[in-house]
């Protein structure tokens, strides 16, 4: 084993240190203590008013609030303002408006904070519950340290000068050393509900692969399938995507690639075998990556997004809540990718040898034998876990019909119950836990939540969002497309979790400032960061597909770039319209 640093690592670390020092010195400093003017405007048919209040930002301990009442023709509003704000992390200026009478909407409320000199800031409601609107502004605090940490982490994540795990461990260390958060607060995200959910999902996925239930399911479906040639690719892609909803995309690709290779080997024509091999192998890779966006446990950015939605948007976002957002993406993109692969590699409509796949799959299925007791127990736990995930919080129309809104146990706790059950029944042992869990993914996810929290606590995310406020000159639908493109581009040079960590904390204040539904922007980013299909190094399924030797680098890049384009159009236009049509987001 080689110890020490390679020349590349030394260069990257040197660049990282220099960049960190430079941005620390040029980064915006924290807000100056003093008195500011807050102008609150409400423009609606039932109340039209503009009021100015004094607000102080101070260095010493302070927590003074005052309440005002604004009267309109048919709407009255009670306003509570924090008039004296201590300049510390996670201590925002808060304005609460409670309306009585005719309904107000968030876009009818705007606040302006100014010092009558160079500081001028426009604020809009961050959260809404019924007719209660909350405007929060976290002023810049420890901003130079926050910018330095973000720069260092971004360089190390993008360049992989040190391992992603090492960078993940560096994040809480820097957060504590720069006095942004206490050790308890900085380390708490490493077992955040999002991390616990993925951890429990990994345990269940490990049980499925250990007892070959995933392989059994895949062979069972393929042995019952019909069709040949190009239609068979769609079947294989559908099975792969379904598996990827519940187990890691790496595991689903690892299961389906050997099946695909066995199918390819049956084709006698060299030319047809070559074209079919490229399409089938890429189809497996793409669907393994795509399937992860369909469920909350399918990909780490999903629970990360849910964490921010629950914490900062005041929305109870459950496992069931994710399905109508993620599943349509898969259902729309899967056939589009399939048609593109057929066109790209000019596949014949039917291939005689593919009629044998049903027989091949059935023979392989029979080799597995009858289900032993262990497999049956895993199936029971798996189905029970899914049932509990779906019934955490039922849709309102179902809840009203049956008189039960759901059991209310969080998805993370349900996942842990499922994992614990597997260990109590000795279906999993310590070796399974140590070898079957992607600990690096959990560390990256936990550190990402810690970094995002630091960006929000120091006001950095709001500051960056304000610098992007120029996007307001564009229509909202175009802003959504731009943000989707940015997410896809960032994930081409960083992991999907890293991309989500950087973009989502910025997206919430950006959307609020532009008058766009923050839930819409968060969901677009969470899904778009999992849409990297162009590079072999982009996702593990792409790496596995490339390692088969069936597809060349040039072919993978050119084919994948079109899939990336399809993904951007589907996620930012078609699916967003569906979300709005069914009332999931406000367009």
Model-identified regions with their sequence ranges:
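Alpha-helical transmembrane segments and, especially, the helix-loop junctions at the ends
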Residues: 202, 242-257, 275-319, 333-342, ...
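A short, solvent-exposed beta-strand micro-motif common in secreted/extracellular proteins
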Residues: 93-99
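Hydrophobic transmembrane alpha-helices of multi-pass small-molecule transporters
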Residues: 1-59, 71, 76, 118-197, ...
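Membrane-interface alpha-helices at helix entry/exit sites of multi-pass transporters
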Residues: 227-235, 268-282, 316-324, 515-520, ...
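Membrane-water interface of transmembrane alpha-helices
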Residues: 209-213, 255-262, 341-352, 537-538
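Interfacial segments of multi-pass membrane proteins
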Residues: 174-178, 306-314, 510, 550-553
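C-terminal transmembrane helix pair
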Residues: 269-271, 327, 446-451, 455, ...
């Amino acid at each position: 084993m080689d110890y020490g640093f390679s020349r590349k690592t030394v260069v990257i670390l040197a660049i990282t240190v220099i960049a960190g020092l430079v941005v620390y010195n040029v980064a915006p400093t924290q807000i100056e203590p003093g008195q500011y003017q807050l102008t609150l405007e409400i423009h609606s048919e039932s109340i039209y008013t503009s009021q100015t209040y004094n607000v102080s930002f101070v260095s010493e301990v302070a927590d003074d609030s005052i309440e005002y009442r604004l009267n309109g023709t048919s709407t009255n509003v009670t306003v509570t303002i924090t008039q004296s704000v201590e300049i510390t992390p996670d201590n925002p200026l808060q304005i609460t408006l409670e309306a009585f009478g005719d309904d107000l909407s968030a876009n009818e409320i705007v606040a302006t904070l100014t010092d009558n000199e160079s500081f001028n800031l426009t604020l809009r409601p961050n959260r809404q519950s019924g007719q209660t609107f909350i405007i929060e502004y976290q002023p810049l605090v420890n901003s130079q340290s926050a910018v330095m940490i973000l720069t260092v982490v971004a360089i190390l994540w993008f360049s992989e000068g040190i391992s992603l795990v090492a960078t993940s461990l560096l994040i809480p260390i820097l957060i504590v050393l720069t006095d942004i958060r206490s050790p308890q607060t900085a380390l708490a995200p490493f077992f955040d509900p999002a991390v616990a959910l993925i951890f429990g999902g990994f345990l269940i996925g490990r049980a499925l692969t250990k007892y070959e239930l995933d392989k059994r399911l895949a062979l069972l479906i393929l042995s019952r399938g019909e069709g040949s040639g190009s239609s068979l690719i769609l079947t294989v892609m559908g099975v792969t995507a379904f598996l990827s909803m519940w187990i890691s995309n790496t595991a689903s690709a690892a299961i389906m690639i050997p099946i695909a290779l066995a199918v390819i080997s049956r084709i006698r024509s060299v030319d047809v075998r070559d074209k079919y091999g490229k399409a089938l192998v890429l189809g497996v890779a793409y669907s393994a990556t795509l399937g992860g966006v369909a469920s909350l446990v399918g990909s780490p950015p999903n629970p990360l997004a849910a964490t921010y939605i629950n914490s900062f948007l005041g929305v109870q976002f459950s496992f069931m809540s994710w399905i109508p957002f993620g599943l349509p993406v898969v259902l729309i993109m899967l056939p589009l990718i399939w048609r593109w692969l057929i066109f790209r590699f000019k596949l014949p409509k039917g291939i005689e040898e593919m009629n044998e796949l049903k027989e091949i799959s059935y023979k392989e299925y029979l080799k597995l034998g009858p289900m032993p007791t262990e497999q049956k127990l895993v199936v029971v736990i798996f189905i029970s876990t899914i049932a509990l995930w779906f019934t955490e919080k039922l849709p309102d129309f179902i809840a009203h019909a049956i008189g039960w809104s759901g059991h209310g146990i969080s998805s993370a706790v349900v996942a842990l119950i499922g994992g614990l059950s597997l260990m109590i029944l000795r279906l999993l042992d310590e070796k399974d836990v140590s070898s079957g869990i992607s600990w690096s993914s959990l560390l990256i996810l936990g550190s990402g939540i810690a970094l995002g929290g630091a960006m929000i606590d120091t006001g950095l995310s709001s500051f960056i969002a304000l610098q992007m406020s120029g996007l307001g000159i564009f229509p909202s639908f175009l802003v959504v497309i731009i943000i989707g493109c940015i997410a896809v581009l960032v994930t081409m040079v960083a992991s999907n979790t890293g991309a989500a960590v950087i973009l989502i904390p910025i997206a919430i204040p950006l959307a609020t400032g532009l008058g766009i539904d923050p839930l819409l922007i968060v969901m677009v980013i969470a899904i778009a960061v999992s849409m990297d299909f162009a590079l072999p190094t982009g996702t593990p399924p792409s790496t596995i597909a490339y390692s088969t030797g069936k597809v060349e680098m040039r072919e993978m890049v050119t084919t994948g770039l079109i899939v990336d384009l399809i993904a951007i159009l589907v996620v930012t236009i078609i699916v967003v319209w569906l979300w709005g049509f069914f009332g999931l987001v406000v367009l």
